[in-house]
Amino acid sequence: MLAIISPAKTLDYQSAVPKLAVTQPLLTDYSQQLIDVCRQLTPAEIGSLMSVSDKLAGLNAARFADWQKEHNEQNARAAIYAFRGDVYTGLDADSLTAEDIQFAQSHLRMLSGLYGLLRPLDLMQPYRLEMSTKLATAKGKDLYQFWGEIITESLQNALDEQGDDVLINLASDEYYKVVKPSKLQARIVKPVFLDHKNGKYKVISFYAKKARGLMSRYLITQRINRIEQLKHFNLGGYQFDDSVSTEREWVFKRDISE
């Protein structure tokens, strides 16, 4: 079983991290191609492309300039400890044990606009490049065209290594769009998290993001290796609702204070 999650815009390269054996990202040849394209852009062009402030555009231009294909613990850190944000608040990697992280290394992948697909212990340098960015390359008009085949093949390879065919989609729609389901020999299940508010159940973005992280954590800490076990997920107060779930979409509901 393999779960995929989105990355985060917020990064942390200051706090202490556990001393674990890190790994090299697997797709840096492609990352280098994107870096080469981004280095040709001015800060103003980066700001326009990414819809960010002049300050952030300058920071990203500097990061593209500083990026090195060789990753080490001086210029990078393990991806699972670098990402911060709602999903990663739910995941709470800092409280996971070394054994948990090793399980995650085989069962969790992070989609990335620059790195394509990251394992938890893969080294990652600071960057910002969202998957929806319309960055034109020799492969097409945007990152979906650049990464689609590559990421899908990488996911298939990871599933083949496990001898399993179940993919849990815990990524946002923006990031999952890069995956080509028709080219995966896999059963894909998308958990949907609904909160009861103002008289009805609906997806509330902040809560849904955190819930994706919570389910990732549950999968890791409970050593989930069979899809049916995920129906017992109850972190954060969510409960599986069989009556509204389908084979492809599993619905988890929660009542929150009005």
UniProtKB/Swiss-Prot annotation:
GO cellular component: cytosol
Source domain of life: Bacteria
InterPro entries from the UniProt entry: YaaA
One GO BP: response to hydroperoxide
Entries under HAMAP family matching the protein: UPF0246
Annotated family: Belongs to the UPF0246 family.
Annotated protein name in UniProt: UPF0246 protein Asuc_0575
Organism placement in taxonomy: Bacteria, Pseudomonadati, Pseudomonadota, Gammaproteobacteria, Pasteurellales
